[in-house]
């Protein structure tokens, strides 16, 4: 039977082999999965357009980061938004290599990549390229959140382009292994970048007791990773008699001195992101969902 989708990028994937039906375990529909593959193929086409190893501009780097981040689990289930991102990537490629689209003798060197080539590749090649792809997708989440706070690293941005180029290129196991190892190396730099962004913006985290009790009165729950979104909400609700509670992976926010100074950041509600539907079902409060903990 023909697969409606194929996705195995998260640890919850069906049967530890891959989600192939009409929807994934995360709730992602097959049409969304196909659009994410199309977006990834467009990003590889953009990397091909700059030949992978050339120095890229800040603008191109940010588009690549945003595009990769869009394909991360629980970031976006909005098909219209994904299609818009695909067009943004294609427009950037057209800006960089305008003659390719009108070339009378196309060489194919800047073509978009068909992700079915990867999913149906030799097992070892598929495994190594998937390690690279899923590694840079996760890294893109760190880079994106750092960028939101106006922190960036040119070496990190450049590696996203290099890695995408390698995924779309016919490579041997021996030639792919150094890139796999470099994913880990650059990921450490990217984690350091995000840590620098968070600590220089919100202070160095310190041990903090966090209550799990919800007080009487109006409140808002915030789930996800985006500290900037939480900051904006705290500033907009200050002095209005509305308490704020974190959920899931937003728990560490309570440890940052800048954020904990808001007295209406009261505590933490619930458990992990995958329990949202059960925990939020009868919650008498609005919920602010931030990336990357969205569930449809």
Task: Report the location of each language-model feature.
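Metallocofactor- and cofactor-centric catalytic cores in central/energy metabolism, strongly enriched
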Residues: 2-296
């Amino acid at each position: 039977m023909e697969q409606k989708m194929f996705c195995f990028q998260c640890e919850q994937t069906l049967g530890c082999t891959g989600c192939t039906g009409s929807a994934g375990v995360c709730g992602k529909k097959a049409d969304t999965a196909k659009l994410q593959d199309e977006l990834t193929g467009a990003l590889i086409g953009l990397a091909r357009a700059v030949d992978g190893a050339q120095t890229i501009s800040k603008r191109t780097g940010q588009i690549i980061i945003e595009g990769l981040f869009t394909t991360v689990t629980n970031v976006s289930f909005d098909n219209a938004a994904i299609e818009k991102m695909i067009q943004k990537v294609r427009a950037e490629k057209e800006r960089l290599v305008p003659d390719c689209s009108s070339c009378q003798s196309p060489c194919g060197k800047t073509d978009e990549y068909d992700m079915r080539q990867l999913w149906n590749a030799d097992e070892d090649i598929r495994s190594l390229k998937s390690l690279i792809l899923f590694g840079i997708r996760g890294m893109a989440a760190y880079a994106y959140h750092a960028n939101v706070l106006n922190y960036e690293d040119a070496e990190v941005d450049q590696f996203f382009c290099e890695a995408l180029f390698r995924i779309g290129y016919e490579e041997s196991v021996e030639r792919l292994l150094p890139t796999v190892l470099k994913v880990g190396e650059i990921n450490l730099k990217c984690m350091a970048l995000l840590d620098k962004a968070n600590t220089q913006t919100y202070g160095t985290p310190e041990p903090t007791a966090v209550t799990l009790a919800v007080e009487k009165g109006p409140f808002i729950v915030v789930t996800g990773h985006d500290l900037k979104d939480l900051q904006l909400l705290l500033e907009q609700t200050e002095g209005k008699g509305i308490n704020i509670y974190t959920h899931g992976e937003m728990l560490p926010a309570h440890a940052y001195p800048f954020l904990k100074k808001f007295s209406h950041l009261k505590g933490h509600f619930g458990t992990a992101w995958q329990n949202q539907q059960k925990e939020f079902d009868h919650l008498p409060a609005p919920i602010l969902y931030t990336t990357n903990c969205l569930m449809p």
